[in-house]
Amino acid sequence: MTRTYYISALAGILTAFMLQGCYKVSPHGYKELAQITINATSDTINVNLGTELVYNGLDIVSSKETTFQWAYGQVKTGTVPEQHQFEKMEVISTSRTINYTFSKVGSFLLRLRVDNGESIEFKYFTLNVNSGYDEGVAILSNDGDGNGSLTFVKTLTAEESAKGEQHVFTNIFSVEGKTLKNGTSLYISDNTYSKITYSGFLIGTNDEDGTIYHMDCKTFELYMTAKMKDFGSYCEEFGGEYAEDKASFGCFFKSADGRLFRYDMNGGFISEITDAPFKITRIFDGTTKGTSTTAKSTRYPLFYDSSTIGIRKSASAGIRTNSEEGWEIVNAGAQRVSSNAYIHVLFRSKSDPTSYKTKVTSSSLSAWATKTEEINGESVKMDVEYPFTTASLKMDSHSKILGNRVSSDVYYTYDNAIYRWSLTSAPGNNPAIKLPAGEQIRDIATNFKGRKASDGEDRLYVATYNPSRSGDHKGSLYVYRYSDDTLVASYEGICDDPSSVIYKYRIN
């Protein structure tokens, strides 16, 4: 039997964790209650599915004999792990150690209760029961004949790193009777409604059926498939959802011929959004960050053509649009450090191609944001906009704009380089990140950790293709740090020609 062991280190270098009990000392001579101190080697415990966890990583100090209880369960819906609330607890040990084999993949809250008859202390852990592909970077790529592969660069746990375990898997797509062909786009999401989780890792393709693969987020096993051939097209790009604890949970995507579709994560069916007022040029998810600890990041579907930007926030609200007469849309991006869903749209004048301006939506996204200024002694209400002129804009409609939770700037791609943009000024002339010579940028992503995750989205992933690279695989992954644009890691020659890259975050 395979076992995972956790052994206590020296007490002098351990992290102490103690919750104060009811210790009473009075001038009248009341007895002081016997204290308990719990020291643990780590606040996170990792174990693989089906592997027995043998945990001995504790130092407990008590002057009296102690009893123990270990219990685990999922974090209560609507709370965060730091609040230490369970949906339901299961006791797995009543001894000092754990000897237990878990049968369910996911991230759980683990609680230790220590009682010496006078005091009770608690220690909480994050318990990760891993499937093997729990967290990391997924790259969808195709060779010259359209044969697809799903490469996975695994984010290793501390224990896996110490053991030097493998973390690059060239192709993890394995579905009996299915061949991945002409992969186009990736998407991942999870939503819980009435204690039912709707989740999925989606793969869009341009195969003969226009297949969309709905994979299990924990194991990459096939859950179901849907076909776009009945609509005469295929999924070109995923982009957004409306899933704020609503039963009508779905992911939106753009077809190759510019139509808007929705994939239902529960039923697995595809429906066309027929009230879309125009053919779509691009689609992206407008992600915004909530301010409270339990707020979710909402990824609304945003899409635009040459003159109008649209959003569908919910099934009942329909599609809202904004445009600007006499101007055409160059590109658009979402501001992510605000609690509101502000979208910045870059326009170019139809009469003067050197004249540009950025306009901002209101927090409801239903109109342009406005401001009031004093002009000739009168208060005048006007739209918020940031004009500038340039004869050589380093951005076009093919540039992918990507925001993050830790910076008011966005990254975007142009001419095989990465630029930063504040969204309230002219885009820069000099790239923030230059890729190695010969690398052609195919897609970028951040380590977005999911709708309920805390902050910490601090990495940029760049999938590239170099036709001159030696060897069979000419696709690579470069990882950069947001804070200073420095290279963190590179994985060269690990895939074919990438079409999509995404961070596969941990999902329960």
Feature names for model-found ranges:
Residues 210-417, 421-422:
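Acidic, serine/threonine- and glycine-rich low-complexity intrinsically disordered segments
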Residues 4, 23-178, 452-457, 465-508:
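Acidic/polar, low-complexity intrinsically disordered N-terminal segments immediately downstream
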Residues 143-148, 196-197, 206-209, 218, ...:
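Short, solvent-exposed loop/turn segments at conserved positions within beta-propeller repeat blades
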Residues 150, 186, 191, 332, ...:
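Hydrophobic core register within WD40 beta-propeller blades
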Residues 384-397, 429-453, 486-500:
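Conserved blade-ending motifs and adjacent loop-strand segments that build the rim/top face
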Residues 133-139, 199-202, 251, 343-345, ...:
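Entry beta-strands of beta-propeller and related beta-repeat scaffolds
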Residues 18-21:
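C-terminal motif of bacterial Sec signal peptides marking the signal peptidase cleavage site
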Residues 1-10:
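Bacterial N-terminal signal peptides that target proteins for export
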